[in-house]
A protein has these predicted regions:
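Bacterial N-terminal signal peptides
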Residues: 7-18
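Bacterial lipoprotein signal-peptidase II cleavage site
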Residues: 21-23
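Cell-envelope and extracellular/periplasmic
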Residues: 25-241
Length: 241
């Protein structure tokens, strides 16, 4: 499994399209040739939750620059996001990539990849899963499940603190492990298209760093080792050697 720094200490993407763990035994009704569902963890704080805006207009009714709709409607940039729209111009979803996310204080929700996998209730936001899901879906021969374990304003120093860092294990670390285990156990029932599939934990995406950066005395000096410990402990607790 390759861990590739893509945005300094604040963002590390770890993707491996190969299986990280021995495949779980297939269910009795699963044909032997049915491709396994590749599972990716998307973890972090508010930016991983999803703060991208689909569309917004100013008081004069003009489209606000920088939104997804603005990019899609500008001839200079439309081609960059053309794959996100269907032939009718509506925002499209995929039938081979799915998301699972439990926003703060709410139960987990599963859905085909598309707009709205965020804590916002307005259906007008999206997160990194939207672009990443299309890349993975195009690259992988078989279904993909993106499990989001992201909660805004949380630090690695305290909230996501892994057991190997000593002190009290962070509640977000424990919740992340629990959410991933629940997804692996339940997604086959929650998502009809995945029924009968094997699930292979295949990658980890970490988009994080702001809160720790606000604590240069304590959190910043520990961030590198805490991140190493996070990876090591996740491998152990999720059975990924």
């Amino acid at each position: 499994m390759a861990w590739i720094p893509v945005h300094g200490v604040a963002s590390v993407i770890a993707l491996s399209l190969g299986c990280l763990v021995p495949p779980a035994p297939p269910r009795p009704d699963a044909p032997a040739t049915l491709p396994a569902c590749k599972v990716f963890i998307l973890a972090g704080q508010s930016n991983m939750e999803g703060q991208g805006v689909v569309a917004r207009r100013d008081d004069g009714g003009d489209e606000v620059a920088g939104t997804l709709a603005w990019i899609a409607n500008d001839p200079r940039t439309a081609s960059l996001v053309a794959h996100l729209r269907g032939a009718d111009g509506a925002w499209a979803s995929r039938d081979d990539v799915f998301t699972r996310y439990a926003p703060p204080g709410r139960p987990a929700r599963t859905a085909p990849l598309g707009i709205g996998c965020t804590p916002h209730r307005d259906g007008n936001h999206f997160g990194p899963e939207l672009a990443l899901g299309h890349v993975l879906g195009d690259a992988i021969d078989g279904p993909v499940l993106l499990v989001k374990t992201a909660w805004g304003g949380k630090s690695l120093f305290t909230d996501f603190r892994p057991p190997s860092s000593g002190g009290m294990t962070g509640p977000c670390y424990a919740q992340m492990v629990a959410e991933v285990k629940a997804a692996l156990a339940q997604a086959g029932e929650e998502i009809p298209a995945l029924r009968g599939r094997r699930f292979e934990l295949s990658g980890f995406v970490w988009y994080h760093g702001w809160n720790d950066g606000c604590d240069p005395k304590n959190a910043v000096p520990e961030y590198e080792q805490n991140l190493v410990n996070l990876v090591v402990d996740l491998r152990r607790d999720l059975g990924t050697p």
